Amino acid sequence: MLGMLRWTTAGESHGQALIATVEHMPAGVPVTKDEVSYQLARRRLGYGRGARMKFEQDALTFLTGIRHGLTLGSPISIMIGNTEWDKWTTIMSSDALDMEDPDNVAAMSSGRGAKLTRPRPGHADYAGMLKYGFDDARNVLERSSARETAARVAAATVARSFLRETLGVEVLSHVISIGASEPYTGAEPTFADIQAIDDSPVRAFGKDAEESMIAEIEAAKKAGDTLGGIVEVIVEGLPIGLGSHISGEDRLDAQIAAALMGIQAIKGVEIGDGFEEARRRGSEAHDEVFLDDNGVYRNTNRAGGLEGGMTNGETLRVRAGMKPISTVPRALKTIDMENGKAATGIHQRSDVCAVPAAGVVAEAMVTLVLARAVLQKFGGDSLSETKSNIDTYLKNIEERMKFEGLEDGA
């Protein structure tokens, strides 16, 4: 759709830089490098992260679309430089290499430059090598790497500011469980709890759940294995009517699910009570509507804030399930694509568990989808125009919900 908020990323894991591009963001949205850096640092959080996180820094440059801390309405480009690029200049060179040069031969025949011919089960390596005709899995894994999500988090920081300025809402996440840990079942956190969540080594909201998750990670680390888990994203204060029932692609739950499934290693998504709803009878599955002097309210939120593909005024609640990291330290069985012989998967440096970071990436994707939905609903070339359109809509909703002659208890 012309004029619709769009985002894309470019770059490889060990390339010179990652690029995040955001198009059709209104003018006047405040953006700072400090805020982007803060969100990128949150993405690196988590007990069980690998050694790479200790030196994987994010060198930021705002290339286009921002002037004096405000968006211009033109395409926004943010570059995240690779601080280790000097170690990869030959291996990831965009120029053709002179293989008569002994330095190039040495760089490309051993260590990180050696051809990777043993695809890792669970990764994009095998299908990617066949689909694109590669004899080196590096041509696949460099782009399929979850390092790419840093660019998505950067793009979403602009969208976060937009949602904050227009609706006054924030997006948060927390980890429900890791591996077979005891899942968190306590009170739903609010944005006021975000610092406490980020201070947790596993981004858990609850000490018992945290301790169970850490124990799982320690056991997996000792066994030379990896873990997945479940994260939850929560957004309070969304207006009624984002999304639409008109067609499948317009349904906000479909858009959110697609965005979350597009995150590396995410294998399942549920909105609200999700799969648990399938076990209930209809009389126990839906959120009844009531009205009092303070307005419409509900006693439950099983739908997770979405009905008929639209926000219904309740808290948005969505969960995503991440599979265990595919790069297993003890290496899984595979074949060598060079000769067809049995082999073990190549072992790239990786984490035991990246679920805490996945929560931050899930926040980013939900944020981008919500910002797009807000602009689809309210439009606006500038932040002030969008805010004015929202104010008018909310006043109309308020007027619509005034019922004349309603008797007490009716």
Curated annotation (Swiss-Prot):
Domain of life where this protein originates: Bacteria
Reactions listed under catalytic activity: 5-O-(1-carboxyvinyl)-3-phosphoshikimate = chorismate + phosphate
InterPro entries assigned to the protein according to its UniProt record, in alphabetical order: Chorismate_synth, Chorismate_synth_AroC_sf, Chorismate_synthase_CS
Binding-site residues, NADP(+): R43, R49
HAMAP family tied to this protein: Chorismate_synth (MF_00300)
Family: Belongs to the chorismate synthase family.
Subunit structure: Homotetramer.
Stated name of the protein: Chorismate synthase
Organism: Corynebacterium glutamicum (strain ATCC 13032 / DSM 20300 / JCM 1318 / BCRC 11384 / CCUG 27702 / LMG 3730 / NBRC 12168 / NCIMB 10025 / NRRL B-2784 / 534)
Gene behind the chain: aroC
